[in-house]
Each structure stands twice: as C-alpha cells, then as structure tokens.
Amino acid sequence: MENMRSENFNQGVSMEGVKHAPEMANTNRRALRDIKNIIGAPHQHMAVSKRGLLDKPAAKNQAGHRPMTRKFAATLANQPSSAPLAPIGSERQKRTADSAFHGPADMECTKITSDDLPLPMMSEMDEVMGSELKEIEMEDIEEAAPDIDSCDANNSLAVVEYVDEIYSFYRRSEGLSCVSPNYMLSQNDINEKMRGILIDWLIEVHYKLELLDETLFLTVNIIDRFLARENVVRKKLQLVGVTAMLLACKYEEVSVPVVEDLILICDRAYTRTDILEMERMIVNTLQFDMSVPTPYCFMRRFLKAAQSDKKLELMSFFIIELSLVEYEMLKFQPSMLAAAAIYTAQCTINGFKSWNKCCELHTKYSEEQLMECSKMMVELHQKAGHGKLTGVHRKYSTFRYGCAAKSEPAVFLLKSVAL
C-alpha cells in the first residue's frame, strides 16, 4: 500500500477517468444556435441529456479522493500540465455553461442574421391580410364613379345630396314609360311612317314656338303611350299631336301657348272643342301620369359626366332628335338613347371612338352595349338631309344650333361594328 502511495506521489494523480469540461460539453450539450434556441425559430423535437457533470457516475479507473497536503500540492505544481484539471463544484458548473454557450474553440461558428430567421406566423398573416385589403381598396377606387357634382355643392337647386337617388329612381321607372316597339300593329288606319311625319312636323312647331327641350321629349312620349292604348283614325292624328304638345307645355313650360295659336298652327283643321275633348281623353287614358323619365332627363346628367362643351351638347341633341322621328328606335330605353347619342356625338366630333371610364360609370353602359344603338344613329345622321323628313336637319343647320347637322357622320363606327 505504501508503495502504491509513493508511486502516485511520483507520477501524479491519474486523470484517465475524468473528462475535461470542454470535451464533455461537446458531447452532452449543443450550442444554442444548433438547437434553435432562438426566438421565432421553428420547434424541433430533440432528446437532450440534462444531467450535469456532477451527476455522472465516476469512471472505473478514477482515483479516490485524498487530502491535499503541502507535499502533494508542491508535486502538482512542479509537474508539467498535460491536461487541465476538471473544475470542482460551482466553478465546474460555471465553466460548463460557458463552454456550452460559446462552444469549443475549434468548432466552426455560423453567424445568423435576422434575414436568415423564418418570419413569425403572425407577421406573415399580417402581410397577406394587408395585401388583400390593398387589393380590395384598389377595386373600390376603380369601381367608384367620379364625383361630378362638387361644382354644384353650394347650389341648392342642384340637390346634390339627392341626385344619385333621383337618377336611380329614373333608371328603375324608365321601363314603365316605354312602349312596345310593335304597337303600330294594333293600329288600323295609321302606321309608323305617319308617326314619323307627325313628329317631324311637331319638331318644327317646337322650334317656332321656342319651347323648352324637355317639352319636345315629353310630347313624343305622350303620343306614343296614347297610340299604344287607343286606336286613332288618320284625320285625328294631328289633333293628337298638338294636344300632346299642349299637355307637355302645361307640365314643363312657364308660359303655355293658348289654344287659339294651336288652332292656327293646324290651319283651323280643328276647333277649340276638339282640342279640349282630346285633352280630356288623353289624360284619362294615361291616368294623368305625366311625370315620366324621358331621354332628356338622362341627357343632362350624362352630358355632365362627359364634361361636355356647347359643341358636344348640340351634336348630342341633334342625334337624339333624329332618333325621336324614327319608329324603330323605340326598342331602346331612354337612358340607352341618351348615352348612345352622347357616345356617337363624341365619335363624330373627335373622329375616333371616345368613351371614358367616367361616362361608363355614370351611364352604366359600356362601349360594346352602346354600339348597336350608335350604329343606327350614324345611319340616321347619314340620311338626315335627304328624303321628306328633314325638319331636324334644317333646325340644326342654323347658326343658333351650331350647324351641327353639317358635320360628317362617324361612318367608321359602321365598319367597326361590321368586323
């Protein structure tokens, strides 16, 4: 036994069974960057040993504990240290934690930046929701009709706060004011040509009496609605026309023509009694319903959306008055006629197709939807100065109406439609 002690004194304490702290940290603990112990990193299931170095069983060949004497301490101090002694107690735990965090000196370290880390789930969801909201907002901006009433905000007569509701009501009720495009089949003594002659003559009368535009459109509407319900003989067709104009003047005008003037216009073909009796018959047939949306109601609104000038306004009214004479145009609703007239007028003036987003949003008609009606209007423009029904052409050939009838029709629309 004494020999063994002396041998140990000479050779030093055997440290075979003791592993150095850095080496043990390598085998039992992984660096924090390796085990993804970082905020926001994805969770990974690992089996990591959590037993400290003190809990490990002693090695088989580890020497037993002995008291530290002065001689033993001097021997250890003089002996060259081939390997550092394992720290004991709290110092060992401190070094173990440091080595676990920093890792051994020869281990390769990878620097992790914020760009390398995966985005948290909430951040990704916020980005997706934000992009979707932006898309929805852009769609709302694109679909919203531009404000064309800001210039009339201080005009109480413009009723800006109610204008959208008013025109929504017009759009819903315009179908009730329309007549069947085939109503002439129920007439026995008159036809569509006679209707055209009557309206062409009334346009001249309207021009001579200097009546309002809305009066003319309401006159034509009253005539069509009455003829669609009552059979009229040929000799009383003119009487229906002048009486319808009298009713329209009472509804729209401030100063109404007297009955005697209408008798003179008809070359005394009818008496005062005839006109008053026909007036009573018309209002009873129509049940006193005179408040109907005509193409004129939509013309003013759509011209405002088109930011029209005087030239475009006169051209638009020239084209739509040509449509009043044509019986075949009854198949289109008043809003369609108004929008198509403005579209055709823009094409006529500019020489190319012109229909912007503002016009489309306010009229609720696309360029494709207007094309059929616009094509027919171009054909009416082409033959306006020829034939027997030239009242509209003569009216709009004057300087008072900007000589709109002398403009070249937009024949390129006919070619584009044919394609």
From Swiss-Prot:
GO terms for cellular component: cyclin-dependent protein kinase holoenzyme complex; cytoplasm; nucleus. Pfam families: Cyclin_C, Cyclin_N. The keyword Nucleus applies. It is found in: Nucleus. Induction: By gibberellic acid (GA3). Residues 79-116 are annotated as: Disordered. PROSITE patterns: CYCLINS. The keyword Protein biosynthesis does not apply. Coiled coil: none annotated. GO terms for molecular function: cyclin-dependent protein serine/threonine kinase regulator activity. Gene3D superfamilies: Cyclin-like. Its main location: nucleus. Keywords: Cell cycle, Cell division, Cyclin, Mitosis, Nucleus. Expressed in the root apices. Transmembrane segments: none annotated. GO terms for biological process: cell division; G1/S transition of mitotic cell cycle. Interacts with CDKB2-1, MRS2-F and MRS2-G. Involved in the control of the cell cycle at the G2/M (mitosis) transition. May associate to CDKB2-1 and activate CDKB2-1 kinase activity to promote cell division. Belongs to the cyclin family. Cyclin AB subfamily. This is Cyclin-B2-2. It comes from Oryza sativa subsp. japonica. The gene is CYCB2-2.
